[in-house]
């Protein structure tokens, strides 16, 4: 598979086989489906894929396991929410059960949250990174940084260019509605395992 430049994601997992027409753009049909990708911990990320009809055939639609290469994209919903998905550039059938999830991004930090600790004691910070693409469009992706990378993100400036390696994940959380009832929501985000900035070296951050 050919890798992309500043926005590259490879998912290998179990197809949910729930292909549905998503939209028509310039006369080309696009379909959506979900792929289940199991982590080493056993947790399953159910992730949305958008794919052109030109990449689909009967064998792919009926396959149990698929390998998909593409870009993480965002789309603003009419209700104010954001749809985050993998836009497929290439797709292949896996002949046996296999799981893989890797994201490589290069973009610019445009918003940072506050550092905090999880219930398990891990340090975490969330931030938004803008990924440029063709035709002056950008995707604004939510990213989580962990442990030593929390200080790293705190010490670099907004608009800094960063390179990120991690996984595309889904995460359930609960939110109260207007009647006070808890409703399950699903967040889609990038959980980073490695972050590098082109503006700061590690020595500069430690000594600064």
Segments predicted by a language model, with ranges:
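Single-stranded nucleic acid-binding surfaces, predominantly the OB-fold ssDNA-binding core
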Residues: 1-208
């Amino acid at each position: 598979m050919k890798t992309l430049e500043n926005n590259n994601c490879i998912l290998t997992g179990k197809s949910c086989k729930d292909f549905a027409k998503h939209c028509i753009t310039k006369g080309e049909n696009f379909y959506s489906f979900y792929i289940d990708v199991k982590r080493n911990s056993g947790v399953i990320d159910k992730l949305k894929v958008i794919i052109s009809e030109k990449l689909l055939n009967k064998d792919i639609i009926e396959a149990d396991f698929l390998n998909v290469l593409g870009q993480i994209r965002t789309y603003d919903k009419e209700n104010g929410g954001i749809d985050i998905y993998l836009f497929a550039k290439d797709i292949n059938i896996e002949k046996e059960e296999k799981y893989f999830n890797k994201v490589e991004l290069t973009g610019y930090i445009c918003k940072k949250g506050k550092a905090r600790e999880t219930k398990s004691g891990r340090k975490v910070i969330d931030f938004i990174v803008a990924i440029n693409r063709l035709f002056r469009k950008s995707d604004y992706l939510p990213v989580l940084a962990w442990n030593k990378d929390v200080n790293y993100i705190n010490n670099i400036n907004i608009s800094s260019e960063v390179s990120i390696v991690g996984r595309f994940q889904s995460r359930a959380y609960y939110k109260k509605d207007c009647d006070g009832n808890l409703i399950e929501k699903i967040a889609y985000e990038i959980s980073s395992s490695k972050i590098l900035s082109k503006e700061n070296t590690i020595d500069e951050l430690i000594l600064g």
